[in-house]
């Protein structure tokens, strides 16, 4: 059920006959874990929050750096050296106070995967390295969670949704992880901020 304040806040959604208050209530009842609060996670977090997804987890172990600011649009100079999950949650709460934001200031790992995934309906992987992508995929398959995946490389981007029940997974698409020495990172090759 939506409060009068939420009905006002989401009025443009609710006005759509195909969506209405029922659609908004479904978003409010939903939950998403976003792994990575970087160049992919930041815009995803903004839109999930603005749309009114009821509960959003933010998993990242990193701090805001000046080099992040040209593409990680949640952050500003005043947040440099702060944990990304804290800075993101603060900004997102200001964007939409009707959403519950849950910071997880830790690296996604085999030891915490079940605990992190268990309470969320969907997982969005915005991580920036192959070991984490494979781990998130495998955990989603193991614990029965749909996975939204995105990645960027210089001027290119990829996005996909993997459903553990009746479709291929990230590991099906890319069976073998590339050698870490063969894969440059954003600091080495650059990345455009508008993807």
Residue spans for each PLM region:
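Adenine nucleotide-associated cytosolic modules
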Residues: 1-195
